[in-house]
């Protein structure tokens, strides 16, 4: 399973990604939030035992942290997407500018289970979004955004305007939910230590919070305790390593920060009802992790409710 890391910069970054082949499931570790648009092909996003399908023409959001994705080229055409990465500070600055300079009243009343539980969102791009990313594609091809942070900031401002002035939806909710810089900092530290051999107390210290304050804020954001959340994230990563690599069980346990193999096997069995070896034997194959009917239905339902 291939891995990529996002290197944080001081400005929003806009880039195009092209892949002519299916590289399988890849791990992406984001230190910034991402808004993306699929020009050609399909993207699959994996979360635990579910798979979510993003199609050509879809606008999507990926929050900070680990994402497991697979990009599928279109028939006779490579997979192409445009990604816009930003921090909460950049988001705050641009939204404040839109509010003060243009009197834009920014509100969001959308709430759903997906917004609360998933670290991504997607919906079909509407006409102004399609035109915007077609223009961005031309700019990237011409190189007019290269080494020009002012141009990137202006494009980011336009994109945010198109989203926040649109009807309430999961992407808008996710976007506005990442304005809090303090929360952003806590999430960055938590995500960067998922596979570190440190205690919850040490993570709280790195967030400049008392253990009690950290646990309270953590529960507000994630709806569970730090210990349970970290174990779940490690098991999710281990499960994908089992079905996408030939690594030994002990090696996977170590890579996912479990103290020993027996402890890893015990927790995995508790979560998935079988040992890692049995899970690998049952689930490896070409049909593994196809989009579930529930996941596809949820995407369609969201699209209908937003565009209706």
Question: Could you say what each language-model-derived stretch is?
Answer:
Residues 57, 214-218, 263-264, 268:
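Short hydrophobic/aromatic patch on the recognition helix
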Residues 108-127, 140-196, 201-207, 220-228, ...:
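Short, Lys/Arg-enriched, Trp-marked, Pro/Gly-tolerant hinge/linker segments that flank
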Residues 5-110, 145:
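N-terminal regulatory/effector-sensing and dimerization cores
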């Amino acid at each position: 399973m291939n891995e990529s890391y996002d290197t944080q910069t001081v400005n929003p970054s806009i880039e195009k990604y092209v892949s002519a082949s299916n590289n399988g499931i890849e791990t992406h570790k984001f230190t910034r939030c991402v808004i993306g648009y699929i020009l050609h092909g399909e993207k699959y996003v994996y979360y635990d035992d579910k798979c979510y399908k993003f199609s050509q023409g879809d606008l999507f959001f990926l929050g900070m942290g680990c994402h497991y994705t697979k990009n599928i080229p279109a028939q006779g055409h490579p997979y192409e997407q445009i990604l816009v990465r930003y921090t909460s500070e950049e988001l705050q600055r641009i939204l404040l500018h839109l509010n003060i300079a243009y009197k834009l009243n920014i509100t969001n009343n959308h709430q759903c289970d997906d917004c609360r539980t998933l670290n991504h969102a997607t919906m079909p791009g509407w006409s102004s979004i399609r035109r915007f990313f077609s223009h961005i594609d031309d700019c990237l091809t011409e190189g007019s955004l290269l080494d020009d942070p002012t141009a990137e900031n202006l494009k980011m401002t336009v994109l945010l305007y198109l989203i926040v002035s649109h009807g309430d939806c999961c992407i808008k909710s996710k976007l506005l939910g990442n304005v809090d810089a303090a929360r952003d900092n806590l999430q960055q530290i938590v995500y960067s230590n998922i596979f570190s051999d440190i205690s919850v107390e040490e993570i709280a210290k790195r967030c400049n919070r008392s253990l009690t304050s950290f646990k309270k804020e953590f529960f507000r954001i994630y709806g569970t305790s730090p210990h349970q959340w970290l174990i779940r994230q490690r098991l999710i990563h281990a499960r994908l390593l089992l079905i996408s690599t030939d690594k030994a069980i002990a090696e996977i346990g170590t890579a996912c920060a479990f103290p020993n193999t027996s402890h890893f096997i015990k927790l995995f069995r508790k979560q998935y009802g079988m040992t890692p070896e049995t899970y690998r034997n049952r689930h490896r194959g070409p049909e593994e992790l196809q989009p579930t009917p529930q996941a596809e239905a949820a995407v369609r339902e969201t699209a209908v409710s937003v565009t209706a």
